[in-house]
Amino acid sequence: MVIMSEFSAVPSGTGQGQQKPLRVGFYDVERTLGKGNFAVVKLARHRVTKTQVAIKIIDKTRLDSSNLEKIYREVQLMKLLNHPNIIKLYQVMETKDMLYIVTEFAKNGEMFDYLTSNGHLSENEARQKFWQILSAVEYCHNHHIVHRDLKTENLLLDSNMDIKLADFGFGNFYKPGEPLSTWCGSPPYAAPEVFEGKEYEGPQLDVWSLGVVLYVLVCGSLPFDGPNLPTLRQRVLEGRFRIPFFMSQDCETLIRRMLVVDPAKRITIAQIRQHRWMQADPTLLQQDDPAFDMQGYTSNLGDYNEQVLGIMQALGIDRQRTIESLQNSSYNHFAAIYYLLLERLKEHRSAQPSSRPTPAPTRQPQLRSSDLSSLEVPQEILPCDPFRPSLLCPQPQALAQSVLQAEIDCDLHSSLQPLLFPLDTNCSGVFRHRSISPSSLLDTAISEEARQGPSLEEEQEVQEPLPGSTGRRHTLAEVSTHFSPLNPPCIIVSSSATASPSEGTSSDSCLPFSASEGPAGLGSGLATPGLLGTSSPVRLASPFLGSQSATPVLQTQAGLGTAVLPPVSFQEGRRASDTSLTQGLKAFRQQLRKNARTKGFLGLNKIKGLARQVCQSSVRTPRGGMSTFHTPAPSSGLQGCTTSNREGRSLLEEVLHQQRLLQLQHHSSTAAASSGCQQGPQLSPVPYVLAPCDSLLVSGIPLLPTPLLQAGMSPVASAAHLLDTHLHISAGPVALPTGPLPQCLTRLSPGCDPAGLPQGDCEMEDLTSGQRGTFVLVQ
């Protein structure tokens, strides 16, 4: 791997102890943007235009001939693509061991990181971004180029938050009717035909990936994911995915038409443009003009921007050499300066939309510094005051010598030598009054490398397991297949052809949500959704934040110190209304349980303690010095009534049954006393208490009226009467009534064991076995 130090040491003879930035050609390297298995990406600034660029530095010594051919093919594809939503290629430099690819720098990074930080997009925002993505992909297809690796990591955002399609490492030429066979791409975005190892049509492959991208933009999560590659493969082949409740019907229809398992039934790019969801915003239709302004980009047709050429000529750069470089697609220093100045001009125009462009100045063999004020582009387009005097100097030779002298200042000895662009005699041709060399090392080595043919598609690839980490976050095949053993193996999807269980259409059924498998809004990152900085409350983070997945989408940045938003909650149904009935039933049940518990449950428990009286199982000292009652054996009537089997009855039925028995017994005893038996003192009903044990006073339980005490009495009516019973609880000691007990009370001796009262009924609230002594049995 190429490792460059950020600064090069200044020779000690200069007397300066500081370090100056590393220079590569006409670029000052500022910092590292990323590193891969065989390349490193640096952020640099052009020394003439002061424009920031991204330089991809590739170590050719670590590439075999097949992978090096892929690199050359990527360069050739980027030379053919000039679109506002595609990363622009500025310059290509090559040495014996190194390859330098200078491209446009997207200031706001990847769409992947944006979703990680802000959550999923609204459908209006997603529609705007998807129009730009669709325009770029359609432009590629019109030039017979297929991308084959469309994903949010390869969608960059410039300073205006516009989409820039990048990374054509898996791109290739295609011809209609001639299928491709290379299995490449990223697992979550790969089409079923790639997993099956079949030949495929390039545009249909990109349409599937576009459907996954649109799903990620709207939902913040992946439609297909899994803990390992076989599980992911099975889900992709089934074509089943979840639909969140907040997705509109039109958006769902569009995604389902793109994510069709059968490639022949999949929607096309032209049909996507005409879909109702895409046509919902008329303003986007006006902005999406296929005949966009390509002035200055169609250099091979002789359509050049005269203002940019005039500025370059005023700076002392040879005009004829610049035109030749543009016509030959050399992408050397001349073309780089031209394209960079053209970008600065467009940025200036977009910053001042009200200003009208003035007519281009008349061609002159040479422009003086005073003539620069007549151009439309002001001097702010060439910033940096320390360098401006040399740029506007009327002496072209002075500029040439200053730039070349600065180039010589580069430290060419030590380990940094292969990283720096070599100084050769061809560089002198950049400026006017210099001889024009017929050939140059910078552009002849990468002019005709890309060749169409089956050899590019029939590459021998070995099946390897999914690595733990790769240069790309979602990649099936890397160009580092035949690198040194220190490099991770490439990722290849199994080539075994498996028949799809559902050919033709995507399944409408929804998978059950699983926190470990499904999107749990982008663990991710997808919420990730680490993915998290400031965001509106309505945006949800990526659902797969912290989830176990074979593809860490929206997970990598989950722990960057930002607040994680809650994951998107997917319902079983397709629409939000599908869950309203279930939620209503749940709320009704909760309210019903609440109302049922608010009345009678405390009293019912106490009634159970009074009605299910028990005998003494073991004599222990009771709490509070409870007095002992000596009672005779219970009457036979009570025994006969309570010997029936009560197994299988509920607690409430037992209480009601015993309560009715007590009331019947009391009624019969009262009638006998009034007919001539021994008359006892007429006492008012006294509370039936278990006083000393719990110091609780339970007021008299009213007896049911006689008409209700019939065999056919409804248990529901008795339950309702019991639930209305009022209990008076007192914490203080209660004096027991003196005098003879009423006939309804019977004293039980400590050793008695009344028949009909099973031992299991010897349990009372707040009364242990040590507190059981003499009890009062309510008859």
UniProtKB/Swiss-Prot annotation:
PTM note says: Phosphorylated at Thr-182 by STK11/LKB1 in complex with STE20-related adapter-alpha (STRADA) pseudo kinase and CAB39, leading to its activation. Phosphorylation at Thr-182 promotes autophosphorylation at Ser-186, which is required for sustained activity. Autophosphorylation at Ser-186 is maintained by sequential phosphorylation at Thr-182 by GSK3-beta. GSK3-beta cannot initiate phosphorylation at Thr-182, it can only maintain it. Phosphorylation at Ser-577 by PKA promotes translocation to the cytoplasm.
UniProt biased composition (Polar residues): 363-373, 628-641
Give residue ranges for domain UBA: 303-343
Per the entry, induction is: Expression is stimulated by CREB1 in myocytes; direct target of CREB1.
Domain of life (superkingdom): Eukaryota
**Required cofactor names:** Mg(2+)
Q: Which residues carry this modification: Phosphoserine?
A: 186, 577
Q: Signal peptide: which range, if any? A: none
Enumerate the UniProt keywords alphabetically. Answer: ATP-binding, Biological rhythms, Cell cycle, Cytoplasm, Developmental protein, Differentiation, Kinase, Magnesium, Metal-binding, Nucleotide-binding, Nucleus, Phosphoprotein, Serine/threonine-protein kinase, Transferase, Tumor suppressor
One GO cellular-component annotation of the UniProt record comes to:
nucleus
Localization recorded for this chain is: Cytoplasm; Nucleus
Q: Which SUPFAM superfamilies match?
A: Protein kinase-like (PK-like) (SSF56112)
What are the recorded GO MF terms, alphabetically?
14-3-3 protein binding; ATP binding; cAMP response element binding protein binding; histone deacetylase binding; magnesium ion binding; protein kinase binding; protein serine kinase activity; protein serine/threonine kinase activity
Activity regulation here? Activated by phosphorylation on Thr-182. Also activated by phosphorylation on Thr-322 in response to increases in intracellular sodium in parallel with elevations in intracellular calcium through the reversible sodium/calcium exchanger.
What residues bind ATP, as annotated? Answer: 33-41, 56
The record places the active site at 149 (proton acceptor)
Q: Which SMART domains match?
A: S_TKc (SM00220)
Question: InterPro entries, from UniProt?
Answer: Kinase-like_dom_sf, Prot_kinase_dom, Protein_kinase_ATP_BS, Ser/Thr_kinase_AS, Ser/Thr_kinase_SIK1/2, SIK, UBA
Q: How does it assemble?
A: Interacts (when phosphorylated on Thr-182 and Ser-186) with YWHAZ. Interacts with ATP1A1.
Q: Spell out the family assignment given in the record's similarity comment.
A: Belongs to the protein kinase superfamily. CAMK Ser/Thr protein kinase family. AMPK subfamily.
Q: What is this protein called?
A: Serine/threonine-protein kinase SIK1
The species this protein belongs to is Mus musculus
